[in-house]
Amino acid sequence: MKYNMWFMFIVAVLIVSQITGADPGPLVLFYNSPAVYQSDVTSNEALPIGNGKLAAMVYGGMSEEIIQFNEDTVWAGHPHDYAHAGAAGYLQQIRDYVWAGQGRAAWNAAANTFMSVPLRQCPYQPTAELRLAFNHSGTTNYRRQLDLTTATASVRYTTGGVTYSRDYFASYPDNVIVVRLTAGQAGKISFTCSLTTPHTVVSNSVSGNDVVLRGAVDHVGRNGLASDIEFETRVRILCEGGSISSSGQSLVVSQADAVTLVLGAASNFVNYNDISGDPGSLCLQTVADAAAKGFPALRQAQLNDYQALFNRVTLDLGTSDKTNNPTNERLDAIEAGVDAAKNDWSLFNADDLQLVALNFQMARYLLISGSRPGSQPLGLQGKWNNELEPSWEGKMTLNINEEMNYWAAEVTNLAECHQPLLDLTRDLSETGAVVANVHYDADGWMVHHNTDLWRGAAPINNAGGLWPTGAAWLCMHLWWHYEYGGDVNYLEEVYPLMKGAAEFFADTLVQDPRPGSAGYLLTNPTHSPEQPNPALGDDGEIVAGTTMDSQLIRGLFTYVMKAGEILDVDADFRQQLQQMRAQLPPNQIGRYGQLQEWLEDVDVPNTHRHLSHLVDLMPAGNITPHHTPEMAAAAEVVLNWKGDDTNNTAWSQAWKMCCRTRLLQGNHAYMILNKILAKSHTDNMTFSRKGNENQIDGNLGVLMGTAEMFLQSHQGEVYLLPALPDKMVAGSVTGLRARGGFTVGITWQNNALSTATIYSSRGSTCRIRSAWPIVVAEGTKSVALQSPGENLYEFTTQAGHIYTVTAYSCPIPIPYDLDNDCQVNFTDFVVLASEWIDNGGGEGVDLADLAQLALDWLECRRDPAGTCWQ
């Protein structure tokens, strides 16, 4: 076989050159001018940094730098029980109105007797601003950037023949924000440093090399609750060369070679019912400890911590010279392309796949920067807020937005960043137990559609807040964390929370008493978020038994039953839940072929932003094209009604994108993604918005929608490339997680799977769904596969082992009659071709011809129809 090794080498080189992705491009946002500062407005241009507890916006000014920052427990209000005493005494009256179809009477009764006290919750607050006055002018070569690989914002410019540089990062290990100032010449760094706040200044002074500001929140939100949060922020200046002097409440740095600023902040918040903390001593100790380490050690600790999370996942969709353009111009180009295409998506030609990858990693960056163990969970604006009255108070909205913030935490390998939401759920199980008792005379716990720093759980704003299934949705996340990680000790810890949520519904679900009804167990009163039942007119806001509620409760009962079985506890309660689950209304298909939003078939086509009755499609994963095709088709009818326009909010568009990926409609999801990039992203890619209403949930929802183009794992399957858009011809992703304890990397070429690697952390059975035939190996050893169904491949794994998945050819006839059977895979092809050459076959066919033939074969194996061979 004298040609065998050469032939295999040539083919291997050619194939690898095709499969290997190009340079994924720089994961950097950059701009050629500073961000514009406005007081009491959260910037859509400044660059965000954060460590979970501290969050800052960097504006990059030359004459004056402003770093607006938040400490995530600085809110209006004080510890407060929002429950409405005596509310349970009116519950039956409200229910009776609903059963009688008198929803307006139910609304009025609830408004007077059942709502939160006060009616609104408290707003998240800005903390302070670090101001550095340079008085630089006449600058050139300006560049402002955010490097996602190092979590570092930077500013560079030249003035007076000197190039100045500033780098900014937030350290989770040291809980400080660090600013590093350098210059191209020694002795050129001079500035004045001060701290300001929009709140009451208790004291503002200089202490040694520190500027210290003590403040008290004085803003009273629209609910009228007095604000009792106090805080301290302190910046320490570490000079290399030059001098430091004081000037009133500021410090002046003169002619330094380099400077490090260490900024900390703390409040008197201990937990939602304790504000006895000492912010002064805590802030002083934090800043002193960090400053003592010095800049190199601070930097290394920050990088080690951040990159251990960020580097877990890579996404390579290729790159182009578009990466040479400022980020805002790239977004503008996509917007121009979307506008030019109008309603004919085939005309869209402004693809920027590297920007798609950048957007994906930007969302992961925001999740890391805004949500870490020990911090508060992300709210509607994440952690970055410069407004005393942010939109919707910057709270945690539980009927879609808060959960969307965390949909992608597990799949994008940031399970630690999920922890603040899980901690919030634990807090709400306590305040929600009070509301369950006071409002519903029920055991267990529940929460309505919003909460704040003080963990309010009662219904707020108006009677439309009577949405009782917040706990059920939050418990979905408790269960997901177990599904991905498999830690039984964790499951033991959270099982009481899940059980408590189920106990509430076991106490409060009521059998439909209306004549002619099917006697289902229903929630009453309830509300489908922002949507009245169209058949009831003014009586349609407060109803019984929405589809969303039934989906969430059915899911909750299922999680609790599974968890109880794993832990071998509460057999009788599991039996009760099983019986009650069978009495919940099923998903129903209506007269238009739509998935019904209501118990009755009364849906009217509409474009409203909420997709509440599609929870079973996304995020729950109980509706899928393969397992429930009729319901999947019914969900698609609803999505087609809703449309893809961005006149709704970005979170709604992100939800639609996620739904399309769940329906395996990658091209449609990609279209929505580009519309979001065009119309709903701000220049800094930080907030998705409607008008000036800044929100972060759209960013994080798109993160989930993008990840699930490449990998989905509900229904017990590791689904490879389930919704790959046609425009993503070649690429790779590494580090995504699948349920069952798997970490997955995938490479594709010509829109088809090439290879995948699967790391098994738990030794679970792995069931793969793949549109392409596959073989699996561990090292050089083939792994036996079972086929439990079409396009399904199942094999056993061992904990700590890595498995390689390789897609092979669709059965095709091999030219030159190499084999009588003519049905071979690639390995067979190489061996047979080599033997054929050795035996003198193929007169007039040389080695190069066969190498090209192998590449042709490679093309064909990614074409399931085999049309290239016809």
Task: Enumerate the predicted regions with their spans.
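C-terminal capping/lid segments that line or modulate ligand- or cofactor-binding pockets
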Residues: 46-68, 73, 113-114, 126, ...
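Extracytoplasmic low-complexity repetitive segments enriched in small/polar residues
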Residues: 741-744, 748-756, 766, 774-776, ...
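Boundary/junction segments of secreted and surface-exposed precursor proteins
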Residues: 19-33, 812-823, 870
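Extended, hydrophobic alpha-helical segments in both membrane/secreted and soluble proteins
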Residues: 401, 470-481, 490-507, 652, ...
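Aromatic-residue-lined binding/catalytic grooves and analogous aromatic/hydrophobic interfacial grooves
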Residues: 22-463, 480-482, 490, 499, ...
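Bacterial N-terminal signal peptides
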Residues: 7-17
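Alpha-helical segments with a strong preference for the paired helices of cellulosomal dockerin domains
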Residues: 818-869
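Positively charged n-region of N-terminal signal peptides that target proteins for export
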Residues: 1-5
